[in-house]
Amino acid sequence: MSVHVKEEPVLVPNCDVENTELAVFNGNGESELENFGTCVDEITDRVNQLEQKVVEVEHFYSTKDGAAQTNTSKSNSGGKKIAISQPNNSKGNSAGKEKSKGKHVSSPDLMRQFATMFRQIAQHKWAWPFLEPVDVKGLGLHDYYKVIEKPMDLGTIKKKMESSEYSNVREIYADVRLVFKNAMRYNEEKEDVYVMAESLLEKFEEKWLLIMPKLVEEEKKQVDEEAEKHANKQLTMEAAQAEMARDLSNELYEIDLQLEKLRESVVQRCRKLSTQEKKGLSAALGRLSPEDLSKALKMVSESNPSFPAGAPEVELDIDVQTDVTLWRLKVFVQEALKAANKSSGGTNAQNNNNTGTGEINKNNAKRRREISDAINKASIKRAKKA
């Protein structure tokens, strides 16, 4: 059945929701249309702002969950471990950098204990070759820098300790070992310097073992403190994000209420559909695609919860629907049919070449006919009443 849908005049609402006068404007309500448009624009701007906040909240929880999964996988792979970073001595002035990276900072007591140990090694009778930088030029050691990548001596270490360039004892330990390892690398085992370096390194390692328990205890304590600090910071962030999420939820709910109020105001200011328009709407519903028809029936069920929108067969009585529902259906049907007319040619050609899709279309067409028949029956009943 071919139905000509009459083009309707412009419907102009007033954003003042208290004004419930019903009216239809044939292009003469520009000011009220502008007023309504301003209301919608303001709500749209607010929704866009809230959308950005929603993205922030979603990003926070997505990254939080990802980090939690990563930590869980790490903990499941083995027992609890405490990572102790090796010192990086590539640059002399490293104290500030080490601290900024959150590495262990030895206590003053531990630093004093290590200084005593260092002084004992430096004052040993065999320590004299290692107290100053190697005189490469004076001794004619032309290949020294080819063999030794990073020269180090006890005198340089002492100066760095006095100027607080070390942040923890592990850094000093690494440099002291480097002094003796360099000597053992460059000199042959039979030479005196090699023997002296090997002996002092052994004594140094023995003394180092004496302070290890306290060092490990300090490092563990610092790791625990950092973990607690991080956990507290995370809890604070989560609380802030949770509060933001609640505020967003409340604001979005308020916007929904405003939109619903505006929609009701629009419909109240619009005239009622005529009998002829209702007949046209009934016929147009039967021409919708199954997907669009389901959407239309869902609109009916939103204002009438008892309406069985998902049932195999439905009987839709246009006369009992609210003005809000009728206008929503009218606008939706017009837009849906326009879109369907634009794409019907290509869609039909594709469906004819696909057997499986053709079978689905047959079933869909059957459902459209059933619903259309039900709507037409309702129209006949209404005509008889008239």
UniProtKB/Swiss-Prot annotation:
Induction: During seed imbibition. InterPro entries: Bromodomain, Bromodomain-like_sf, Bromodomain_CS, GTE1, GTE_bromo, NET_dom, NET_sf. SMART domains: BROMO. The NET domain could serve as an interface to localize different proteins or complexes to chromatin. PANTHER family: OSJNBA0053K19.4 PROTEIN. Keywords: Activator, Bromodomain, Nucleus, Transcription, Transcription regulation. Residues 263-344 form the NET domain. This is Transcription factor GTE1. It is found in: Nucleus. Residues 345-358 have a biased composition (Low complexity). One of its GO terms (biological process) is positive regulation of DNA-templated transcription. Transcription activator that plays a role in the promotion of seed germination by both negatively and positively regulating the abscisic acid (ABA) and phytochrome A (phyA) transduction pathways, respectively. Pfam families: BET (PF17035), Bromodomain (PF00439). Residues 105-211 form the Bromo domain. Residues 66-106, 340-386 are annotated as: Disordered. Barely detectable in stems, leaves, siliques, and dry seeds, but was present at considerable levels in roots, flowers and imbibited seeds. Disruption phenotype: Impaired cotyledon greening during germination. Seeds are deficient in the phytochrome A (phyA)-mediated very-low-fluence response of germination. Mature plants appear normal.
